[in-house]
Swiss-Prot record:
Keyword Nuclease: no
Organism: Borreliella burgdorferi (strain ATCC 35210 / DSM 4680 / CIP 102532 / B31)
The protein's Enzyme Commission number: 2.7.2.3
Main location: cytoplasm
Gene3D superfamilies: Phosphoglycerate kinase, N-terminal domain (3.40.50.1260)
Family: Belongs to the phosphoglycerate kinase family.
Pfam families: PGK
Protein name as annotated: Phosphoglycerate kinase
GO cellular component: a single term: cytosol
Keyword vocabulary terms for this entry: ATP-binding, Cytoplasm, Glycolysis, Kinase, Nucleotide-binding, Transferase
Subunit description: Monomer.
Reactions catalysed, as given in the entry: (2R)-3-phosphoglycerate + ATP = (2R)-3-phospho-glyceroyl phosphate + ADP
Positions bound to substrate: D22, F23, N24, R37, H60, L61, G62, R63, R119, R152
Length: 393
C-alpha cells in the first residue's frame, strides 16, 4: 500500500508536529536497557527539526492499565533523547489538558518536547474520540512513526487522524516498503524462514507466505507438530494436538503449489526443558520417546544453507530452537549468520529473531530489521493495519 509521508506535507515551518513514536523500550531499574526504538525515530525527528517544525512526541510505555504510574513514566526516554539529539527535550507532566496545550503553543521552531505516557488514560486503548480530540490539540499536523503500534486502533495511532492532516514518518515508510515489497513482488528465489514455539501464533503467517515463497523453512517448537502430522515420533517435544490437521493440510498444499518445505531432519534434544540440560544429537527425523527437541541439527542447517545462499529474498521470523538457553541457541545463531551473509534482500522481523541478530552483532548486515513485533506479524499475515490505513493515499 502507498502511504503519505512527511515528504508529502507542504511546510512544517512554525507548525506543531504531533509525532507518534514507539518508545516502548525495556527498562531495568529505571534505566533503558535497549534504545533501538528511540534511535529508530531519530531520522524523522531530525527531518522535522531541519524544516522548522515544533516537535511534540507522543508514545506509550508498558501496560499501566489506564492509571498514572511513575514506574511507566517516559522521563528516561526524554533523557536519552536529549543525549541523542544534543538538545534539551522537555518532559511534560501529562499528555492532554490546557497546561500541556499551552506548553506546546509556547514552543519555538526546532524545539522538541515529550508528552507523558498516553496509556496513563484508559481512553487511549479504547480509541476514545474525546480523548483523541484532546490529544490532537497538541499539534497542527499528525505524523505516525510508530510501526510497532500500527496494528492497534488506539487514540494516538488512529483517532487523532480524524482531527489533523496525517502523514507517516520515515520508519513507517521503511517498514511499509520492505514488508509490503515482500508480499507484493519478491525477487526470486524467495525463502521464508519461520520459527517460534507455537503453530497457533504462526500459522496465519505461514499460510500468507506459502503462495509467495519458493522455499519455506519451519523450525522452533512448532516444527514438532508438523513432524508429528507426517508420522514421525517427536518424543516429549511440544505438540499442539488441535493443529495436527492444519499442519498436515499446509504441507499438502505446499506440495500442490510446488513449494519446498524444510522441516528439521535431525535434532539437538534434552531430557527435560531446562537451560542446564545436556544437549544430545539425534541423527534422524524421529526423536526418542523420553527426549525433548530443543534445536535443529547439522544436517538441517546444511539444507537451510543450500537454499539461503542462492536466495534473492529472505524473510526470517522466529527462532529455530530454544534460543534463550545458550546450549540450544546454536541453530538460531547459525541461521542468523547465513541470513546476514546472503547477498539478496534480507528482512528480519519478530522480537526473538531481531534479538538474535542483535545478540550476534549482525543487524548491520541485514537489509531491514523490523521494529514491529506483533505489527510485523500481522502485516505479513496480509492484514490491513489500522495505523497504516489512516495514512493511505
Amino acid at each position: 500500500m502507498s502511504i503519505k509521508t512527511v515528504k508529502d506535507f507542504s511546510s512544517f515551518a512554525g507548525k506543531r508536529a504531533l509525532v507518534r513514536c514507539d518508545f516502548n523500550v525495556p527498562l531495568k531499574e529505571g534505566s533503558i536497557s535497549d534504545d533501538t526504538r528511540i534511535r529508530a525515530a531519530l531520522s524523522t525527528i531530525e527531518y522535522l527539526k531541519e524544516r522548522g517544525a515544533r516537535i511534540v512526541l507522543v508514545s506509550h510505555l508498558g501496560r499501566p492499565d489506564g492509571k498514572k504510574n511513575p514506574k511507566y513514566s517516559l522521563k528516561p526516554v526524554a533523557n536519552r533523547l536529549s543525549e541523542l539529539l544534543g538538545q534539551d527535550v522537555k518532559m511534560l507532566s501529562d499528555c492532554i489538558g490546557s497546561e500541556v496545550v499551552n506548553s506546546t503553543l509556547q514552543m519555538k521552531d526546532g524545539d522538541v518536547v515529550l508528552l507523558e505516557n498516553v496509556r496513563f488514560y484508559a481512553e487511549e486503548e479504547k480509541n476514545d474520540k474525546n480523548f483523541a480530540k484532546k490529544l490532537s490539540e497538541n499539534g497542527d499536523v499528525f505524523v505516525n512513526d510508530a510501526f510497532g503500534a500500527a496494528h492497534r486502533a488506539h487514540a494516538s495511532t488512529v483517532g487523532v487522524a480524524d482531527y489533523l492532516p496525517s502523514v507517516g514518518g520515515f520508519l513507517m515508510e521503511k517498514e511499509d516498503k520492505f514488508l509490503g515489497g515482500i508480499l507484493k513482488n519478491p525477487e526470486r528465489p524467495f525463502v521464508s524462514i519461520i520459527g517460534g514455539s507455537k503453530v497457533s501464533s504462526k500459522i496465519a503467517v505461514l499460510e500468507s507466505l506459502l503462495s509467495k515463497s519458493n522455499v519455506v523453512v519451519i523450525g522452533g517448537g512448532m516444527a514438532y507438530t508438523f513432524l508429528h502430522s507426517e508420522g514421525y515420533s517427536i518424543g516429549k517435544s511440544l505438540l499442539e494436538d488441535e493443529y495436527i490437521g492444519i499442519a498436515s493440510s499446509f504441507l499438502k498444499k505446499a506440495k500442490e503449489l510446488g513449494v519446498k518445505v524444510i522441516l528439521p531432519l535431525d535434532h539437538i534434544v534434552a531430557d527435560d526443558f531446562n537451560k542446564n540440560s545436556i544437549p544430545e544429537y539425534i541423527d534422524s527425523f524421529n526423536i526418542p520417546e523420553n527426549k525433548i527437541g530443543m534445536d535443529i541439527g547439522a544436517n538441517t542447517l546444511k539444507e537451510i544453507e543450500n537454499v539461503v545462499k542462492t536466495a534473492k529474498t529472505i524473510i526470517w521470523n522466529g527462532p529455530l530452537g530454544v534460543f534463550e538457553f545458550d546450549s540450544f541457541s546454536k541453530g538460531t545463531a547459525k541461521v542468523a549468520e547465513m541470513v546476514a551473509s546472503c547477498s539478496g534482500l534480507t528482512v528480519v522481523g519478530g522480537g526473538d529473531s531481531v534479538a538474535a541478530v542483535n545478540k550476534f552483532n549482525l543487524s548491520d548486515k541485514i537489509t531491514h530489521v523490523s521494529t514491529g513485533g506483533g505489527a510485523s506479524l500481522e502485516y505479513l499475515e496480509g492484514r490491513i493495519l489500522p495505523g497504516i490505513k489512516v495514512l493511505e493515499n
